Amino acid sequence: MMMILSGFLAKLKGNMNKVKPIGIGLLGAGTIGAGVINALEGKSDLLTERIGRPVKLMGILVRNASNHHASSNIDLPFTENAEALITSDDVDIIIEVLGGEHPAIELINLAIKSNKHVVTANKEVMAKHGMALLHNANKEGVLIGYEGSVGGGIPIISALTHQLATNEISAVQAIINGTTNYILSNMSAGGASFNAALNEAQMKGFAEADSSYDVNGDDAAYKLAILSSVAFRSAIHDVDVFREGIESIGPEDFIYAKELGYCIKLLAISKLEGQFVRARVHPSLIPMDHPLAQVNGVDNAIELEGDLVEWSMLQGPGAGSGPTTSAILGDLINIGQKLDSAGLKPNNIEIASKYKSLPLDDLETKYYLRLHVKDLPGVMAKISRVLGDMNVSLATVIQKEIDDEAESTAEIVITTHKSLEKSMQNAIKQLKSLDVIKAICS
């Protein structure tokens, strides 16, 4: 039996060598691009087995082909001519890992018009232009895979478009930025400052040299826009996602959070509210016993609420080239398996404009404030009066003296009962005008 099977496999492999390979055009050779190149080379037999046809890298778009040729240990087909690569008859699938909006969007559009299937991990492009790209791809009869644009190693797009497709998703709550989750986990566990935790993340390769895109919430907002659009089948634009980063969070906040029974995470939240969607990214206090509180390091996790599944959570690594490469190759296999299907029809989901976006003003939730104030009699009464006038009700108050050689200073931490966002923002404006307030820290 083994001899017959081995002979069959050998014959199958021999036949594969006669089959026209699937041509791949790779746009970009940075960290993710290098991961894709290595995987295409190292997993060529596995890809052939999974797809049923061999895969061949026909060209790699870079800015300076000479430099790449000089520094590469193996002979690779580097090119600076994007149009020639994308429109080549030998290329079937374009993998875009350039990052950023331009020139990526123009090149993806060229690929679609040239009847090429596309795999991209570009969160900014998909957040800003995803609806139009999917529509145009359907019109041209090509597929777009974009699993790598959201959850790293979490196959969330596949889950939403296939396994959970019969669910009416009503809410998404997620940790979807590995860099910020690593920073916050480090600050929580070791008491590190924000800058120290960021530096460590950069040293370990979990954060870019310029990490503002991550720490200010933009990266998570792009991902939430994509995730919400797919989950609700309605276009949620990145500009409609409120975002607040983690730069103002200090080690003290983690001490107080633990004292109150919480941990701090950068959450991405979107919910259906009637015919509206409210999407937001901001630091949040999560109860210690909540599943998301256990998601640490570079891991991501995505919670979904659906009418059939009720509740589901997917978790996996969210930073580094490995998880994104895994998602890209998964999309490549999915498209590759369909290339030989008779009468291939594109099955990109169409994202309509069913729901309008809600601003944050009338959001009702609980709040946390940390203040530095002059340590004088009557200060708390003034703060309480301002909050009360704005219909913000106090839940807990912690006050501690802090060292300040210039003058006596106290640190006050306040949590509130559910209050309107606009009421809280008005209260903060009023608090800043009080002469007893030295700083609103977070």
Enumerate the predicted regions with their spans.
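Substrate-binding/catalytic subdomain of NAD(P)-dependent oxidoreductase enzymes
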Residues: A196-Q294, D299-A301
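A short hydrophobic/small-residue beta-strand
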Residues: V118-V119, L394
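Rossmann-fold NAD(P)-binding glycine/threonine-rich loop
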Residues: A104-L110, K123-L160
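ATP-dependent carboxylate/acyl-activation modules
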Residues: H290-K366
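A conserved regulatory-domain signal marking ACT and ACT-like small-molecule sensing domains
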Residues: L332-S442
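Short, ordered loop/turn segments at secondary-structure junctions
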Residues: R63-A65, E83, G99, K123-V125, ...
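N-terminal glycine-/serine-/threonine-rich beta1-alpha1-beta2 phosphate-ribose binding loop
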Residues: I4-K113
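Oxidoreductase and adenylate-handling cofactor-binding alpha/beta cores
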Residues: I156-I169, T180-A192, Y222-I236, D331
